[in-house]
Amino acid sequence: MNRPVKGAADKAGKPKVKRKTREELEREARERKKDKKHRGHVAGSRTQEKASTDQRSGQRKAADPRIGSKKPVPLGVLDSAVAKPKPKSKPSAPVENVVAAKPTMSPEEELEMLENDSRLDALLDRLDSGETLSAKDQSWVDETLDRIDILMEELGIELGDDDEEEPQEDMLQLLKRNNPKDAF
């Protein structure tokens, strides 16, 4: 059981590695540090558009991703029916249903609602007490009162102002009385 000698065979098979100088070691360390510094994403890469989309659309300008959609936003029941592009294969019957779905009140219901409006009552009380309303409030009061007048005319309701007027006297009664204020 002979053991091989370690030192003699190992030295003969491998060439001797030259040790690096201090300057070489420092230069390699600087390069490694430089490589580590440049790892990761560049600054602002989250907000940048992908480069692959720019390559596909060659003529298209690079758009700012912060700008939102150009699709119109529906603001109400009628606006949403108008803003939607009409499909060519389907008839326009659903659009008519949307327009007809707008809740309409009878004139009596609308008049009742306007007469019981707490905002209108509060603003009219402020006007009666001598306060000056803002232009916005004043225009709203005027529009609401005009609408009430229109609804009352539609329904054939007359204002209750007739009670304040003096009853008309008969011409014969005036002549018989010989009232001095009626004489010219």
Curated annotation (Swiss-Prot):
| One Gene Ontology MF term | GTPase activator activity
Q: Does the keyword Transmembrane helix apply?
A: no
Q: Which UniProt keywords apply?
A: GTPase activation, Ribosome biogenesis
Q: Where is the composition biased (Basic and acidic residues)?
A: 21-32
What's the domain of life for this entry? Bacteria
Alphabetized Pfam families for the sequence: YihI
Where is the segment annotated Disordered?
1-107
Q: Where is the composition biased (Low complexity)?
A: 80-95
Instruction: Tell me one GO biological process term.
Output: ribosome biogenesis
> What's its job?
A GTPase-activating protein (GAP) that modifies Der/EngA GTPase function. May play a role in ribosome biogenesis.
Quaternary structure and interacting proteins, as annotated = Interacts with Der.
- Tell me the NCBIfam families matching this sequence: PRK05244.1-1
Regarding protein family, the annotation reads: Belongs to the YihI family.
Q: What is this protein called?
A: Der GTPase-activating protein YihI
Where does this protein come from, organism-wise? Answer: Pectobacterium carotovorum subsp. carotovorum (strain PC1)
Q: What is the lineage of its organism?
A: Bacteria, Pseudomonadati, Pseudomonadota, Gammaproteobacteria, Enterobacterales
Q: Which gene encodes it?
A: yihI
